[in-house]
From Swiss-Prot:
Designated gene of the protein: mtnK
Pfam families: APH (PF01636)
Function: Catalyzes the phosphorylation of methylthioribose into methylthioribose-1-phosphate.
Residue numbers binding substrate: D225, R331
Disulphide bridges, residue numbers: none
Source organism superkingdom: Bacteria
Protein known as: Methylthioribose kinase
PANTHER family in UniProt: METHYLTHIORIBOSE KINASE (PTHR34273:SF2)
Keyword Coiled coil recorded: no
An example Gene Ontology molecular-function term: ATP binding
Chain sites annotated for binding ATP: N38, K53, E107, D108, L109, D242, P243, E244
Pathway: Amino-acid biosynthesis; L-methionine biosynthesis via salvage pathway; S-methyl-5-thio-alpha-D-ribose 1-phosphate from S-methyl-5'-thioadenosine (hydrolase route): step 2/2
Reactions listed under catalytic activity: 5-(methylsulfanyl)-D-ribose + ATP = 5-(methylsulfanyl)-alpha-D-ribose 1-phosphate + ADP + H(+)
Length: 393
């Protein structure tokens, strides 16, 4: 029959035909996707539920004028299965993948909430940073040259060639926000600050270097879009979803994206900033602890036995995370895909002020010449930006 876009009605028919439910079952189906690229259906029969996610042949946020390969569903399914090999507790179970329809059938996570939404509503998720830090520590180590022999890594890399979605990252994270491109989206009150960034040659030189790192450094399998909207959580559980941007890339990329989205939440949620900074600090400490233990116990690369090599690697990861965080903060403020943390601020004057702070924070992160791997740098730069008279760096 070939590819066709599912509806709530045809999704019910599909799951029955594929044997996920009995043909006589009464199934309730809702389209629940709020993302930019896919349809997501929640189906349940009163006893159990499943999720059906279907990739569209175009970017939903733009329309059919922006075509995309359906292979990203295969990328996502493959990434979830790789992640499950190392950290099954932190990803949803995959029940099936239909390549022709670009469909993934997976575990129902409706008992959990999206972290971005929960944070905005005042949730704290005490185990979030531990879980994300451990997830990244294991996945990045085991898919890097430090934990995977080079032949296997090259074969795995070949399975995650993801040109369409990598191009989105190249454009929307590293290029468009730093110039006058039509994909940008911002309030006119930000124009003078934005033009200041566009004219900052030192800033653009830094962005150029981070873009080049993303283009060329195939260090490990990265999620590629790890933000608070791609994580479900409760007070006890964390599940990382939506790795359709997965590819081999820099070790510090996912860390930077995740921390950037925490910073955006901190800008908008003054009363919970200490909770956010707790998570930033703990994410890094759990990542370092996990990565270090695996390096010592399971390192396969010859030079993992050299004691001075690990601190250099961790410093390299941290420096990259700081710069990638800067790009992401700016992108989420004025680029194509915003975050509700900022856009949801009702009072316009405050929203504009917070967005200005976000732009200056992003610039500060990019221009900061990190020495060592001091996680406090995020809090220090943040406090400077939001303090009186500290909006310019």
């Amino acid at each position: 029959m070939g590819y066709y876009a599912l509806t709530e009605e045809t999704a019910v028919q599909y799951v029955k035909e594929q044997g996920y439910f009995e043909k006589e079952a009464t199934i309730v189906c809702r389209e629940i996707g709020d993302g930019n690229l896919n349809y997501v259906f929640h189906l349940h029969d009163g006893k159990r539920g499943i999720i059906v996610k279907q990739a569209l042949p175009y970017a939903k946020v733009v329309g059919e004028s922006w075509p995309l390969s359906l292979n990203r569903a295969t990328i996502e399914s493959s990434a979830l299965q790789i992640f499950a090999k190392y950290v099954p507790e932190f990803v949803p179970k995959v029940y099936g993948h239909d390549k022709e329809l670009a469909v993934i059938v997976m575990e129902d996570l409706s008992s959990l909430t999206i972290v971005r939404k929960g944070f905005i509503e005042g949730e704290e998720y005490p185990l979030l940073s531990e879980h994300v830090g451990r997830f990244l520590g294991k996945v990045l180590f085991y898919t890097s040259d430090f934990g995977l022999n080079t032949e296997e890594k090259r074969v795995l890399d070949g399975k995650f060639i993801n040109p369409d979605l990598c191009k989105i990252t190249e454009d929307l994270v590293f290029t468009d926000p730093f110039g006058n491109y039509e994909t940008n989206d911002y309030e006119r009150e930000l124009q003078s600050v934005i033009e200041e960034l566009w004219c900052d040659k030192n800033l653009k030189l830094q962005v150029a270097q981070y873009k080049y790192k993303f283009l060329t450094r195939k260090e490990a399998l990265i999620h590629g879009d790890l933000h608070t909207g791609s994580i479900f959580a409760s007070s006890k559980e964390t599940k990382i979803i939506d790795p359709e941007f997965a590819t081999f890339g820099p070790l510090g990329f996912d860390l930077g994206q995740f921390i950037a989205n925490l910073l955006l939440n901190a800008l908008s949620r003054e009363e919970k900033r200490e909770v956010v900074f707790f998570h930033i600090e703990k994410t890094w400490s759990y990542f370092v602890d996990t990565f270090t233990k695996l390096w010592i116990l399971e390192g396969v690369e010859t030079y993992t036995k050299e004691k001075q090599w690990l601190p250099i690697v961790l410093q390299h990861i941290f420096r990259d995370a700081v710069g990638f965080a800067g790009c992401e903060v700016i992108r989420r403020t004025i680029g194509l895909a915003h975050v509700v943390d900022l856009d949801g601020i009702v009072e316009k004057d405050r929203r504009i002020q917070v967005k200005k702070q976000a732009l200056y924070l992003g610039r500060s992160l990019l221009l900061h010449q990190t020495k060592g791997a001091d996680i406090q740098v995020f809090k220090t730069l943040f406090q400077h930006i939001v303090s009186e008279g500290g909006i310019k760096v």
